Amino acid sequence: MSLTKTERTIIVSMWAKISTQADTIGTETLERLFLSHPQTKTYFPHFDLHPGSAQLRAHGSKVVAAVGDAVKSIDNIGGALSKLSELHAYILRVDPVNFKLLSHCLLVNLAARFPADFTAEAHAAWDKFLSVVSSVLTEKYR
Amino acid sequence: MVHFTAEEKAAVTSLWSKMNVEEAGGEALGRLLVVYPWTQRFFDSFGNLSSPSAILGNPKVKAHGKKVLTSFGDAIKNMDNLKTTFAKLSELHCDKLHVDPENFKLLGNVMVIILATHFGKEFTPEVQAAWQKLVSAVAIALAHKYH
């Protein structure tokens, strides 16, 4: 599965807007994930997961920054996220189903913040893009 | 059986009361067909589904979307009794329509995203969680009679 030129253009242009709210988007995405899918909290027993916690904010920023890296290297997501892919495969070992859950919560966040931009076409492009990112992050699992 | 708290029921019913079910239904089904094109497999008789604008403007998509979302309204009136409420529809989707229950999850998530576009800030993480619980429970109820 690879992104068309149109899809890449949609992602890159929306990212310009998204990046101005990157940190809050990251934090809120994680909040949404933990509230809607509480089982995902099992990966963070060492975190204070109360809304607004410093750890949540830091981790949210990290996650969104990684998405940003993928956007900036949208022609070579595999290369851009290679180290992160190894981290998830050998250290974190997050079950692959959770990437869909996180992706969905990010999409909900984007839809709520940028409703005019989040057309059906943009929704499709973002869903596909995050699906590619998820594949890259799980491709070394076995 | 899934139990919804008073807060969860309030989160669901308050947004539902503000929705234009007819429009939202068309949007939800349309987005499903755009974002997950393989779901078009169930709708060969719908005519032109060749592009996002064709899909979203397609009158059959709008009509069917309205039907689907109106039925979802029954779920909201019967949140404590979803399996019974959807027993007949479940049999229909299995025996006559042959729909993989995975599609119920896809549609549920598309609906959540549409709610987010309509309600913005009001669609808080807590409100989303209530809706995720509902769409998941409806998906399970619709799959319950599969055999």
Curated annotation (Swiss-Prot), chain B:
Domain Globin: from-to ranges: 3-147
UniProt record, GO biological process: hydrogen peroxide catabolic process
PROSITE patterns per UniProt: GLOBIN (PS01033)
Residues reported in the UniProt entry to bind heme b: H64, H93
SUPFAM superfamilies (alphabetical): Globin-like (SSF46458)
Residues recorded with modification Phosphoserine: S14, S51
Tissue-specific expression: Red blood cells.
Keyword DNA-binding applies: no
Superkingdom: Eukaryota
GO function terms (MF aspect): haptoglobin binding; heme binding; hemoglobin alpha binding; metal ion binding; organic acid binding; oxygen binding; oxygen carrier activity; peroxidase activity
Family of the protein in this entry: Belongs to the globin family.
Purpose: The epsilon chain is a beta-type chain of early mammalian embryonic hemoglobin.
Listed PANTHER family: HEMOGLOBIN FAMILY MEMBER, HEMOGLOBIN SUBUNIT EPSILON
Record text on subunit structure and interactions: Heterotetramer of two alpha chains and two epsilon chains in early embryonic hemoglobin Gower-2; two zeta chains and two epsilon chains in early embryonic hemoglobin Gower-1.
Protein name, UniProt field: Hemoglobin subunit epsilon
Lineage, uppermost ranks: Eukaryota, Metazoa, Chordata, Craniata, Vertebrata
